[in-house]
């Protein structure tokens, strides 16, 4: 998994730490012993570390580390070992994380006793610093000492039962900000297989600078527009390129992943695509309004969008001259030829002569 964006300050505070070391062939036991020593001051209680194989044959490691006291650090390199840098996340559900780590291991190492957290965690939360704290001081204490989303909401419910009952959505919002959900490792929904995926030479020229290379400082990527018949494999091809945000039917910003390399807008009519200029223009740091959510700033770096449309929903036919001018200036336009496919036909077995 990709690490957090460098544009955001790093803060990790949790008694349950989930680590992923991509492209790491190290022995799980060696990694576990070094991690155990790294968190000695927080009193480690349990660790499980497993080595798995990517579909491309490369190895990666997952580890769940549980400590008596929450690990508190602003050092994004604290868990670096032998030159390997992990993705660091707070384990929202230690039971699910442990099951995820142990699903298909090639090698496993465990130390200590696993601590399942099925209900509100009581733990060793320190007492309030003063005898009669006010509401703000209690809330600050909860924010400072909660180690998970579940514990945070449990403490709020205990200290402010009326506010919890009437303003739960606001507490859930702050809990999600303090303890983001775990981003599972991306696995392409369309891995290389038979029949092989393919694309036009002109699109190959677009791929290199816009998907496979980082943008130069101050520059912007270029988007790609593909229009053509249905059932030609264009969606399968577009989704095979790497980690992406995928939207079909509507654009839902609530699940937007900043670590994605590119966006895909698939079969959404032009009039129903909000922020189309920002997406097509690969703009940075624009504000969106997710449904049932608060406005937020997204796309901290220039990111291309692949727009896929069938011939009957051709965006260019719906645009004003001014919109079309912007579209053509910021997007490579590819109109499919009759009979064109995005995959090679499967090879038929040779027929025997009679």
Curated annotation (Swiss-Prot):
Listed GO CC annotations: host cell nucleus
Protein name per UniProt: Replication-associated protein
Assembly mode: Homooligomer. Rep binds to repeated DNA motifs (iterons). Forms the O-complex, which is a Rep-DNA complex involved in the initiation of RCR. Part of the C- and V-complexes which are RepA-Rep-DNA complexes involved in the c-sense and v-sense transcription.
Motif (RCR-1): 18-21
Description of its domains: There are 3 rolling circle replication (RCR) motifs. RCR-2 is probably involved in metal coordination. RCR-3 is required for phosphodiester bond cleavage for initiation of RCR.
Function: Essential for the replication of viral ssDNA. The closed circular ssDNA genome is first converted to a superhelical dsDNA. Rep binds a specific region at the genome origin of replication. It introduces an endonucleolytic nick within the conserved sequence 5'-TAATATTAC-3' in the intergenic region of the genome present in all geminiviruses, thereby initiating the rolling circle replication (RCR). Following cleavage, binds covalently to the 5'-phosphate of DNA as a tyrosyl ester. The cleavage gives rise to a free 3'-OH that serves as a primer for the cellular DNA polymerase.
Region (Oligomerization): 174-186
Coiled coil stretches, renumbered: none
Key words, A-Z: ATP-binding, Covalent protein-DNA linkage, DNA replication, DNA-binding, Endonuclease, Helicase, Host nucleus, Hydrolase, Metal-binding, Multifunctional enzyme, Nuclease, Nucleotide-binding, Nucleotidyltransferase, Repressor, Transferase
Keyword hit for Nuclease: yes
Predominant subcellular localization, coarse grouping: host cell
Domain of life of the source: Viruses
Motif (Nuclear localization signal): 291-302
Cofactor(s) needed for function: Mg(2+); Mn(2+)
Binding locations of a divalent metal cation: 52, 60, 62, 104
Motif RCR-2 per record, residues: 60-62
Cofactor stoichiometry and binding remark: Divalent metal cations, possibly Mg(2+) or Mn(2+).
Annotated InterPro entries: CRESS_DNA_REP, Gemini_AL1_MSV, Gemini_AL1_REP, Gemini_AL1_REP_central, P-loop_NTPase
Catalytic center residues: 100
Positions of ATP binding: 228-235
Chain ranges of the CRESS-DNA virus Rep endonuclease domain: 11-114
Sequence segments annotated as region (Transactivation): 251-269
Alphabetized Gene3D superfamilies for the sequence: 3.40.1310.20, P-loop containing nucleotide triphosphate hydrolases (3.40.50.300)
Example GO BP: DNA replication
PROSITE patterns associated with the record: CRESS_DNA_REP
Family: Belongs to the geminiviridae Rep protein family.
């Amino acid at each position: 998994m990709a690490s957090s964006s460098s544009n955001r300050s790093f803060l990790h505070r949790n008694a349950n730490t989930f680590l992923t070391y991509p492209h790491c062939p190290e022995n799980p036991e060696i990694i576990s012993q070094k991690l155990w020593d790294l968190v000695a001051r927080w009193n480690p209680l349990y660790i499980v570390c497993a080595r798995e194989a990517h579909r491309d044959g490369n190895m990666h490691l997952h580890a769940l580390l549980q400590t008596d006291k929450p690990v508190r650090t602003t050092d994004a390199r604290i868990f670096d070992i032998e030159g390997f840098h992990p993705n660091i996340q707070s384990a929202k559900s230690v039971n699910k994380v442990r099951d995820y780590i142990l699903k298909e291991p090639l090698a496993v190492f465990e130390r200590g006793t696993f601590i399942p957290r099925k209900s509100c965690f009581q733990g060793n939360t320190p007492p309030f610093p003063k005898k009669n704290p006010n509401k703000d001081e209690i809330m600050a204490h909860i924010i400072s000492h909660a180690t998970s989303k579940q514990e945070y909401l449990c403490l709020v419910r205990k200290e402010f039962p009326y506010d919890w009952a009437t303003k739960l959505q606001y507490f859930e919002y702050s809990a999600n900000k303090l303890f983001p959900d775990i981003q599972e490792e991306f696995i392409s929904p369309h891995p290389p297989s038979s029949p092989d995926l393919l694309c036009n030479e002109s699109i190959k020229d677009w791929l290199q600078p816009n998907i496979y290379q980082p943008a130069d400082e101050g520059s912007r990527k270029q988007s790609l527009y593909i229009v053509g018949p249905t059932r030609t494999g264009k969606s399968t091809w577009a989704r095979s390129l790497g980690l992406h945000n995928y939207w079909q039917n509507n654009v839902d910003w609530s699940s937007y992943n900043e670590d994605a390399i590119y966006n895909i807008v698939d079969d959404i009519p032009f009039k129903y695509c909000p922020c189309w200029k920002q997406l097509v223009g690969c703009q940075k740091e624009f504000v969106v309004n997710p449904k049932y959510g608060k406005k937020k700033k997204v796309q901290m770096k220039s990111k291309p969008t692949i727009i896929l449309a069938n011939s009957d929903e051709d965006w260019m036919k719906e645009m004003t001259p001014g919109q079309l001018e912007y579209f053509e200036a910021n997007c490579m336009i590819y109109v499919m030829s009759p009979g064109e496919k995005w995959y090679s036909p499967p090879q038929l077995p040779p027929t025997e002569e009679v």
